[in-house]
């Protein structure tokens, strides 16, 4: 097995970090810090466990399985195509990429020119997605682009904010708000869970695997080893950045009342750097959104070109980029109304697959564990989404009796029940053969 140099491992880790670290990762921790106030540190522990731990486990699970399709194929052969396609569409051009382009505009030119109309947005997104498409055309060069250029630049800017905040009186940590007062660690865990970064772990695996193959790592054992190391490295770096951003949010308590992390960051940046802070924040968002968009376009195009080989990688990259650009300009609000419920439906299924994949060594011989567990979680998830988006919470009076349902993780008990049933069915059918 070929061994990578430490520098190459670092570059792979930085590459994965930059693909994970998008606008949402910039916004969530400051708002957590703002709401947690004096309880920021214990809240961040919970946040990091889920926001960093789940993606790391996702990368490791994919590394063990070999690919997303292989992991999904343990449920059923048709599931190996259908489920990854749904995930790639909705976390890519269906939501993630157009939202990144839109947020890059809102936090950049949109902050400097609040009266800018749709024409300016169109001009900006044409340039933004042209750059994304151009840089996505050479997947083999992404490790150098992310590891040597974009990620160090992004980290330097975030470090500048942290250093400046340490030597500037910004504000005081206030009393925690809501559940951050009673159960700060658990609330932090729930907020980290809602970042849904574990979904990204499933689809970025193909990019990391191909980057490793370009470095001569061809065997399954080597790919699994270095993908896992990259996942842990990216997770550690994410944790450090979350602590910095959480602290920045915590000291903003006396600066005003805010309803989201973007407003917290904007106010802190203005306090620290004046009008120049708005420009710096715009650059940070632009680079973060650019990295995520490139990663998503690349991973989606690599997947679709392998699943549907009659259309080349470059054509898929063009299609994904153009569709994302159009959606960023034409009704992102409407897209969110459709995409967010679908993501809410597939997220518990994806997490169930990740957990099962981690223990495949022990459960793989039981033929029905994957299928029964995933289908029970899928049924519960569908009922939950219908309740929230169609039935206007009419079923909540019944569903609330499921443990952890009101906290947003009610799928855990159905998953455990499904796993137990899967074992029973597997053993029973095996005995009857």
Please annotate each region the language model reported:
Residues 31, 78-114, 289-306:
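Hydrophobic transmembrane alpha-helices that form the core helical bundles
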Residues 11-21, 162-171, 180-245, 280-289, ...:
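Hydrophobic, membrane-embedded alpha-helices of multi-pass small-molecule transporters
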Residues 354-420, 428-433:
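C-terminal membrane-solvent junction of multi-pass transporters and transport-like membrane proteins
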Residues 135-165, 339-351, 370-378:
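Membrane-interface loop-to-helix entry segments
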Residues 69-73, 241-290, 297, 341:
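TM-loop-TM module centered on a large, flexible mid-protein loop between adjacent transmembrane helices
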Residues 62-71, 129-150, 214-217, 326-338, ...:
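Membrane-water interface regions at transmembrane-helix termini and the short interhelical loops
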Residues 93-97, 155-180, 198-199, 247-250, ...:
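Hydrophobic alpha-helical segments and their helix-loop junctions in multi-pass secondary transporters
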Residues 53, 57, 153-165, 227-252, ...:
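Selective recognition of specific alpha-helical transmembrane segments in multi-pass small-molecule
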